[in-house]
Curated annotation (Swiss-Prot):
A Pfam family assignment: DUF5312
InterPro entries from the UniProt entry: DUF5312 (IPR035196)
UniProt-recorded name of the protein: Uncharacterized protein TP_0110
Lineage: Bacteria, Pseudomonadati, Spirochaetota, Spirochaetia, Spirochaetales
Superkingdom, natural source: Bacteria
Amino acid sequence: MRGYGDAMNEQLSTFDKLVETLSTEDAQRMLAGIGKALRTSEANAETPAKVKKKRAFARWDTREDSLAGETFFFRFWIGVKSFFRSSSVEALYEETLLQRLGNDLKAHYAQYIDVKEKTFTKVFYDKMGELRKTQVFFDSLLACYNSDKGDFYLLLSSFITPVVYEQLMACSDPFAAQGDGTPSGLRASLLKRMDVALATLSGPHKTELYQAARAIEWMKVFCEVPVDRILLRFTVISPASAVCPITILQSELEKLACVIHDSKHIPDAVLQGLFVLKSKTSLHDAQVDNAAHAAAFLKEASAALVVIKDLSHSIPIEDFVRFAGRNIRWQPRAIAGGEDWFVLFKKAWKKRFNEKWALWSTAQKRLVLKEQMLSLLGREQFSELTHRPWEGFWYQLVFRREMSFVFLKNLFEGAYARVVSPPLNVILAEGSFYRRDELIEYTDAVNVLEQMGAKIRNFEVRLSPVGEWGVAFSAQRKEHTVTMKSKGILEALIKVIDSEATVLLDATLKAFHCIGAMLASMIGASKTSAYATLTNWSDIRGSDNASFREQASQARAYVQTASRALVEMENLETTHL
């Protein structure tokens, strides 16, 4: 059934939908362009660092024996000074190193820090402003990563190790698997193949994936640095002047220094993956200019990478921290993260397998149930809905109760009139009920069933091009601009169709249950029924009473079987879809 395929597609995970999109030639070409442009940007960003003059001082050696490298006269002088001040040689030496550090900062980085006034300058403020923009850009990408790390690692593997990725895609999808006997046998076989595929992941590829995991975890820590707080602590005197005492930024600068010191190379695959996750909705929309979207991303990503590299090469943040905190021994902490990438990677593939398996199991149940329905109807295939106005839109719409409704349509097009209706109408015409309220209940149930065929036909008219629903869909089809409003209208329309179909299905089920219970009481098939039998059950149709009883028994069995099929299908449609 066409609707069933659409329903299954709607259940695909974000990752599977992305896979469908990324398989297109245009998407692959776009991603390749992103990777090439990012590599060019990084190369250009590295060039200034290579030609930049060497700093006048190296990272300060804070080992206790560093004093040994000083001249004899300096060591003699500091020893005498220590004696008269009653201070340790190490403490005095650290003071000297801090003085040297201050002099070096004054000589080479006066544009960022005023050593004499112990304040940061407007140039440093501007650099922090650029860094904040970079944070905002990365933060927008990380929102997608944080929502589902598993999907990101699956997507990452498609860029880094495509062969293993293809193997895992195949063995995590029971729809693509060849027959392996029983469902339990198929499941065990696929899981074993997944373990084998994971074991084939080579050392270099594992290293690349680990580096990518460390890079993105570093990005998370980078975005957590309170750069916005640094900016707020500045006093902006004029557009050309802003100052901030170095001491009040000590805590924030320590965090920034740790991040910059332990900065990681961000692989192309990481940014490509984040771009795809961020753009997952627009990539499916043919009306969105994905090339322009990619170009804008390239511009922002390139600028962000340049800002980070420029900051790490041009500003000695660590020495700012040492000078501000008067602690020459201060060292940045290493940033951990990404070590659990393989655990997340395996869990993500297992999650995908379980999702696919649930869909596959549901599909198998639907196929079996569909065969049972067709057998009950005496048909080889269903007579489908004549009109399906929700198809062909930019936004996928699914009539969730479609299979149940199509079964109902086919039931009332033939089988009901042939098997169920005749004995029911005979009872209505000739039956003598003990209780009047049971006669009323039976009459109402039969009327519901007798009118159901006309209601189903009216439902299909409403779906036609001249019907209210068909006209509404046609009006939306003429809209050339995709908006949230149009999406909301489409969703509301399909929801109304679903709701109206459910009303008819529920009414039929209620009538079937009533008729089934009453017939069971009449023919003596239930000893616990709340309903009484007919006073003239043995006299109906006179000499044809035996034949009539057989027809009534067949009608009851038919109604019960149809009811069970509708209930089972409802469970599949509402629970799994």
